[in-house]
Every structure is written in C-alpha cells, then in structure tokens.
UniProtKB/Swiss-Prot annotation:
<dbReference type="GO" id="GO:0039660">
    <property type="term" value="F:structural constituent of virion"/>
</dbReference>
<comment type="similarity">
    <text>Belongs to the morbillivirus/respirovirus/rubulavirus M protein family.</text>
</comment>
<keyword id="KW-0261">Viral envelope protein</keyword>
<dbReference type="InterPro" id="IPR042540">
    <property type="entry name" value="Matrix_N"/>
</dbReference>
<dbReference type="InterPro" id="IPR042539">
    <property type="entry name" value="Matrix_C"/>
</dbReference>
<dbReference type="Pfam" id="PF00661">
    <property type="entry name" value="Matrix_Paramyxo_N"/>
</dbReference>
<dbReference type="GO" id="GO:0019031">
    <property type="term" value="C:viral envelope"/>
</dbReference>
<protein>
    <recommendedName>
        <fullName>Matrix protein</fullName>
    </recommendedName>
</protein>
<dbReference type="GO" id="GO:0019068">
    <property type="term" value="P:virion assembly"/>
</dbReference>
<keyword id="KW-0946">Virion</keyword>
<comment type="function">
    <text>The M protein has a crucial role in virus assembly and interacts with the RNP complex as well as with the viral membrane.</text>
</comment>
<dbReference type="Pfam" id="PF23765">
    <property type="entry name" value="Matrix_Paramyxo_C"/>
</dbReference>
<keyword id="KW-0468">Viral matrix protein</keyword>
<dbReference type="InterPro" id="IPR000982">
    <property type="entry name" value="Matrix_Paramyxo_N"/>
</dbReference>
<dbReference type="InterPro" id="IPR055413">
    <property type="entry name" value="Matrix_Paramyxo_C"/>
</dbReference>
C-alpha cells in the first residue's frame, strides 16, 4: 500500500485573467416574466506567436424546452407559445474563422433549430439533431454535423427530467466566444489517455479551482471549504502524459528526478471556454520522447473538464472560478505499480499570469459586449 505523499511547495503566481472563468450575469428582460436576456461572453487566449492563425471557439449554453404544440388555426395576432424550461444544456459549435460582429452573432441565434432526443447504449445518451444553424456559423465545426451524439451527463444538467414521448428543442441563451490561436486546438485521443503499461510512469495533473459560491449553498456541500473564505475549492485531475521508466539501477528515480523532468518541461496552466470549461496546458521547454504524443508540435494540449468531472463542469456553467494552484503527480501507470508506490507530487506548475499581448482582436477578456431578449 502506498505511503505518505511527498510535496514540493511553491508560492502561487500572480493573479490574471487567464486563471479565471467568469459566470454570465443573470439579467432579466423587463417585459416577460422570468425571461433571461441573451448574452455573449468574449475572450482572447493567444499563443504569443504572431504568425499563428487566429480562430474562434463558439460554445453555447441554454435550456431544453418541450416543443410547442401547434393549433389547427393560427391568426396574425397569435402570440408565440413558450413552453417551460425542462433543464439547462450545453452544446459546442466548435472551431471556425474569426467572427467580427458580436451583435450579429446574438441576432443570428433566432435562426437556430436544434432538436434533442434521449437514447441509450451502455449508458444514457443525448442526440442533438441540427436542423438549422445561422449562416454566420457555416464554417464552424457544427455545420458539418447533422447529428451530434453525446453522453447525457456531460451536456445536460438534469437528464433525468427528459422523458419518452415528448419532443424537445434546445434554445440558446448564452454564447461564449473564445478567440484563440489555432495551435491551441489539440486534444489527446481517448485510447491514449486510457492506456496503462508497466513500462512507463503516469504523470497526472491536479488543478485546484476556487469556485464562486456561497458557503451555505447546495454546491458547497460537494466541495472543500476555501481557507481564504472566497468560495469553495474543487479538485479535478487529468492524465497529462507518460514518462519512460528508467533502467539505470544505480540511479534513484525519486522526487528530485521527477522535479527535474517537470522543470525542464516548463509547464504552464490556464483555463478557458472551448469544449465547455477547459484546462489548457503548455509545455514551453523540453518534452521527453514518451510524453510527446500528449502535446502538439507547439507544446499545447486542452483538457475539457467535462471529460474528467462532468458534475464539476456543469457547476461551472453557472458559477465563476479561478485556478488556485496546479500540481503534477507521478504514479505507477499500471494498477499493480500504482498500489505499491507513493505519489510523488510536483507543485511547481505555473499558472499563466496573463494572455499573450497580441492586439489582432480588440475584444476584452470576458466583457459582456451585448444583450437582447431571449425571444
């Protein structure tokens, strides 16, 4: 059985926008009881290389409603029926070219027609049927997908509320647009993340998030209390990469060896909204050969939080957060080795103190640019 953990402390880097993911403010429409205003959230995350092409990630948040029933006769004065909200939902439109007009983006949402169905295989799934999307997003990933299948617990807040025999529609209310460098768009293939071998050691990453919530709120019961009294603390883990086991029997592969490897990689972590709330990791130094498949050619990798912790990701749909600290943990890769060895923790992961100073787009990070009624 593993013994105590070994920790290498480091003071926390300065605060910055790249550490935070702010929640959308709740703004009610003056007309229409209980009607939220549509809003757009804009942010830039750039690699620092002026030659790197810029793209936009568009992510949507909204609500699933039952499709309104149509009557036999409809007059000119008939009001559009709005059915009650069933549950909240998230759907990513994916990456595409840079979009220049925030107001146009909000108005274009009226042209969206996305149907929602529930199904199952080895677990519950949600099927999004893309009947129509705004022409503005024709070059984004969603335009190539007529059907999107996903795990229900990752994209729907309360999938248990969706029942058989009811037709559902997804209504977009919040639009999150991230202007980023094309080199940031990299995720590791799931089979590679899931593979375990006795020939390597696994490097995990723990990110501690300070989530904005009240101490007496329901979500606070599932998190740690913040010693600074500014919210609650949530821990989320990712499989970062693998390191080859050393074969030199005269060398000690301890925390000093691991710290040296991590220090040479020069790891930096930040947070953004790409495939939903997403942790971005950049290796700015030497990447060991065994670890290279886990990063792209420029040293970037993205880890959507919903892949590791769906419940935490759904909490962040409506709550802001910031990165409190990040650590890398060295473990045995196969379960037999994992059970017999201590975790070696490297706490010197830097939190990116600010976005790259590139002024290709004049949008300020997380500035609410425009809003309109959710009709």
């Amino acid at each position: 059985m593993a013994g105590s953990q070994i920790k290498i402390p480091l003071p926390k880097p300065p605060d910055s926008d790249s550490q935070r993911l702010n929640a959308f403010p709740v703004i009610m429409a003056q007309e229409g009881k209980g009607r939220l205003l549509r809003q757009i959230r804009l942010r830039k995350i750039l690699s620092g290389d002026p030659s790197d092409q810029q793209i936009t990630f568009v992510n949507t948040y909204g609500f699933i409603r039952a499709t309104p029933e149509t009557s036999e006769f409809i007059s000119e004065s008939s009001q559009q029926k709005v059915t009650p909200v069933v549950t909240a939902c998230m759907l990513s439109f994916g990456a595409g070219p840079v979009l220049e007009d925030p107001q146009h983006m909000l108005k274009a949402l009226d042209q969206t027609d996305i149907r929602v169905r529930k199904t199952a295989s080895d677990k519950e799934q949600i099927l999004f049927e893309i009947n129509r999307i705004p022409n503005l997003f024709r070059h984004h990933q969603i335009s190539a997908d007529h059907l999107i299948q996903a795990s229900s617990d990752k994209y729907v807040k309360s999938p248990a509320k969706l029942i058989a025999g009811v037709n559902y529609i997804y209504c977009v209310t919040f639009l999150s647009v991230t202007v980023c460098s094309a080199s940031l768009k990299f995720r590791v293939a799931r089979p590679l993340l899931a593979a375990r071998s006795r020939l390597v050691r696994a490097v995990q990453m723990e990110v501690l998030l300070r989530v904005t919530c009240k101490k007496d709120s329901q979500m606070a019961k599932s998190m740690l209390s913040d010693p600074d009294g500014e919210g609650c603390i949530a821990s989320v883990w990712f499989h970062l990469c693998n390191l080859c086991k050393g074969r030199n029997k005269l060398r000690s592969y301890d925390e000093n060896y691991f710290a040296s490897k991590c220090r040479k990689m020069n790891l930096t972590v930040s947070i953004g909204d790409m495939w939903g709330p997403t942790i971005l990791v950049h290796a700015g130094g030497h990447i060991p050969t065994t670890a290279k498949p886990f990063f792209n050619s420029r040293g970037w990798v993205c880890h959507p939080i919903h892949q590791s912790s769906p419940s935490l990701a759904k909490t962040l749909w409506s709550s802001g957060c910031e990165i409190k600290a990040a650590s890398a943990i060295l473990q045995g890769s196969d379960y037999a080795s994992l059970a017999k060895t201590d975790d070696i923790i490297y706490s010197k992961i830097k939190v990116d103190k600010d976005a790259a100073n590139y002024k290709g787009v004049s949008w300020s990070p997380f500035r609410k640019s425009a809003s309109m009624s959710n009709l």
